[in-house]
Amino acid sequence: MAPKQLRIGTRASQLALWQANWVKGELEKRYPGMAVELVKIKTMGDKILDVPLAQVGGKGLFVKEIEEAMLRGEIDIAVHSMKDVPTEFPEGLGLYCITEREDPRDAVISRGVKFADLPQGARIGTSALRRQAQILKVRPDLQMVVIRGNVETRIRKLTDENLDAVILAAAGLNRLGFADQVSEYLPVELSLPAIGQGALGIECRLDDETIKDTIAFFNHPDTAHAVRAERALLWRCEGGCQVPIAAHGQVSGDTLTLTGFVASVDGTRSVKDTISGPVTECEKLGIALAEKLLADGAHEILAEVYQREVAREKEIPV
């Protein structure tokens, strides 16, 4: 039986609140009479806005404080953008649901110019190293400008910082009603998305059977399989915000196709490959693709980016 009250932990950004309110609305529709409360929590990633994420370092910049609140019993579930969720969780917590994915692509907002027609040396604003690496791979003449802040702030920087274009995740723009400002959607072949891009994750205490039963309906199996494969690849590559790693999985029937990409920050060296297999083996596929990328040159690229060796072998947790 569903609880009478449920507390959702969320960041206080415009997009995070949209996502948490969407979950709240779906819960209230399914369980009339349930009192759902949003608990806003400020994370380290929200506090440090003047430094690129890659330089802040560490993992879980947008989730750690929320998880701590859950461990203290102050919230029942947490709603995250899947691309912000680390591959490992504090003991007792876990990712129980992954929602149906929104548009996973990256979107360009420019001054009416298509990406292919951007002038030589154009200034492009983005927050993600994987975008930067992939864009520079095809257009090494472009100047990449690191932008931070919420979606609206980043769009405003097009004018405020005299940029020629900004690149953001399409999902966030769609959710917040900014789709009409998009000049162009970049195909995944050009800009492979971040791990989990477009999907939401719902985290809870793994021993709370009532909450798990209550939220189970949010899980979208095809998206969950695809995202778990992407996350397995990231886990094997020991990835975080400070490295250009991208992956995108797609499910068709019983088959999962996963593409992965690892690059140097300037895009001059990169390795990309695709693997297919049974959807039931999603995490094994992610690790197998990661092993292939590492063997084909990603190991050396990552060792340079991390300034340390990447494990030649990694034991899969039971």
Curated annotation (Swiss-Prot):
Catalytic activity: 4 porphobilinogen + H2O = hydroxymethylbilane + 4 NH4(+)
Record key words, sorted: Porphyrin biosynthesis, Transferase
Zinc as UniProt keyword: no
Pathway(s) it belongs to: Porphyrin-containing compound metabolism; protoporphyrin-IX biosynthesis; coproporphyrinogen-III from 5-aminolevulinate: step 2/4
InterPro entries: HemC, Porphobilin_deaminase_cofac_BS, Porphobilin_deaminase_N, Porphobilinogen_deaminase_C, Porphobilinogen_deaminase_C_sf
A biological process term (GO) from this entry: protoporphyrinogen IX biosynthetic process
EC code(s) of this entry: 2.5.1.61
Gene Ontology terms, MF aspect: hydroxymethylbilane synthase activity
One Pfam family this sequence matches: Porphobil_deamC
Swiss-Prot/TrEMBL cofactor(s): dipyrromethane
UniProt superkingdom: Bacteria
Cofactor note: Binds 1 dipyrromethane group covalently.
One GO CC annotation: cytoplasm
Residue(s) carrying S-(dipyrrolylmethanemethyl)cysteine: 241
UniProt similarity note: Belongs to the HMBS family.
Cited function: Tetrapolymerization of the monopyrrole PBG into the hydroxymethylbilane pre-uroporphyrinogen in several discrete steps.
Subunit structure and binding partners: Monomer.
Protein name (Swiss-Prot/TrEMBL): Porphobilinogen deaminase
Native source species: Geobacter metallireducens (strain ATCC 53774 / DSM 7210 / GS-15)
